[in-house]
Amino acid sequence: MEFRNNFQELKSQIEYLSSLNKEDVTHIIKSSIYELESLKVFNEEELNEINKVTLISEPFNNLFFKYNKERLITKGVVYIEEENDLQFIISLFYFFKQRVPILFHTNSKLQLQSVDILFKFLEENGVSKKILMGINV
């Protein structure tokens, strides 16, 4: 029974994320990146990598995927556990941009701080924080 309830909750989060406006998602990511920049823990090259997330095209811009998308599974859940802070943050923003529910496990203070910043801007923009769920391993 618990699995069924979890599945229904997951399904509702996927539908909710799909309904989010692309501009709102981009705004939340950019606001979070700006806040991360103010922490002054990343060098210029790392910040450029993080900023690329907002420039990445929608998933079906590639011609193969564009014409085969009705046969591909495009909804699911992502689990992020990464030692490298930069990769964790890029993955977090990327999968949020793709509107995929995220389960995560933080491995550092900076990763936790990044999640808190994203939560802050989700809340400020009226977006449910249920789309991100921390998991203690």
Predicted ranges, named:
Residues 88-136:
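PLP-dependent aminotransferase-like
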